């Protein structure tokens, strides 16, 4: 049954959905890695696809940018389409010089300046953490593929253009590995509605050094991250 933001039919989505922010990255993942691909939704050009990877049914759909957009799609996928596992695959900015551009970060927890989880947790601080079984599966896949990765906290920012750059110093002191815009909201939605979620991101730019990747590279590369996530997804 269609929702206000997804026009897929019942049963169109697999139990596990890879969840990039960019709908064109969703299209790239589907066309590059999946077989027997079918586009299942296109409302507002937020594209979603279902296919198979090594014989296992997998879906991929864009989430848009930021916690509000991500939360809408995550909620509808879980509540209306019965999705059980949502794995964000995207990009982030690095803060520490110990983290390099193109490193893969697995977000065990997500700090945030958003109030969204306080709204769902009666004004209290909610510990936005990933599902351990998803984390374990992705770490195992990374180890088997020999992919370099880091596990730790990310920061989900409400503002891309921050008015408070000194906050980066605090994040580095507290060992936050990367800054992105969705994970804290995704983890909250998953907990609220009984699903599992994980955030896996590749460092696309470095806040300290100024090194960055191009928009084309962000859209169509970072294949190591996608491959290790898919390898984990078929074990769930």
UniProtKB/Swiss-Prot annotation:
A purine D-ribonucleoside binds at residues 5, 180-182, 204-205. The keyword Lipid metabolism does not apply. InterPro entries: DeoD-type, Nucleoside_phosphorylase_CS, Nucleoside_phosphorylase_d, Nucleoside_phosphorylase_sf. Keywords: Glycosyltransferase, Transferase. The active site is at residue 205. GO terms for biological process: purine nucleoside catabolic process. Coiled coil: none annotated. PROSITE patterns: PNP_UDP_1 (PS01232). The record marks 218 as: Important for catalytic activity. It catalyses: a purine D-ribonucleoside + phosphate = a purine nucleobase + alpha-D-ribose 1-phosphate; a purine 2'-deoxy-D-ribonucleoside + phosphate = a purine nucleobase + 2-deoxy-alpha-D-ribose 1-phosphate. Phosphate binds at residues 21, 25, 44, 88-91. Its EC number is 2.4.2.1. The keyword Signal does not apply. It comes from the Bacteria. One of its GO terms (cellular component) is cytosol. GO terms for molecular function: purine-nucleoside phosphorylase activity. Catalyzes the reversible phosphorolytic breakdown of the N-glycosidic bond in the beta-(deoxy)ribonucleoside molecules, with the formation of the corresponding free purine bases and pentose-1-phosphate. Homohexamer; trimer of homodimers. Belongs to the PNP/UDP phosphorylase family. This is Purine nucleoside phosphorylase DeoD-type.
């Amino acid at each position: 049954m269609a929702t206000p933001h997804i026009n897929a039919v019942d049963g169109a989505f697999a139990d596990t959905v890879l969840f990039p922010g960019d709908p064109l990255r969703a299209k790239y993942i589907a066309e590059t890695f999946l077989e027997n691909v079918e586009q299942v939704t296109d409302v507002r050009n937020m594209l979603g696809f279902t296919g198979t990877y090594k014989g296992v049914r997998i879906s991929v759909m864009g989430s848009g940018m930021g916690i509000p957009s991500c939360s809408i799609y995550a909620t509808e996928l879980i509540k209306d389409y019965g999705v059980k596992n949502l794995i964000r695959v995207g990009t982030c900015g690095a803060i520490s010089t110990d983290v390099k551009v193109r490193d893969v970060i697995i977000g065990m927890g997500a700090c945030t300046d958003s109030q969204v989880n306080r709204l769902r947790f009666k004004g209290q601080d909610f510990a936005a953490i990933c599902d351990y079984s998803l984390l374990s599966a992705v770490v195992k896949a990374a180890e088997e593929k020999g992919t370099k990765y880091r596990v730790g906290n990310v920061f989900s920012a409400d503002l891309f253009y921050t008015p408070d750059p000194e906050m980066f110093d605090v994040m580095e002191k507290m060992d936050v590995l990367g800054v992105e815009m969705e994970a804290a909201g995704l983890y909250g939605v998953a907990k609220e509605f009984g699903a599992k979620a994980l955030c896996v991101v590749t460092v696309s730019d470095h806040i300290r050094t100024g090194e960055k990747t191009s928009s084309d590279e962000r859209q169509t590369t970072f294949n190591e991250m996608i491959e290790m996530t898919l390898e984990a997804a078929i074990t769930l």
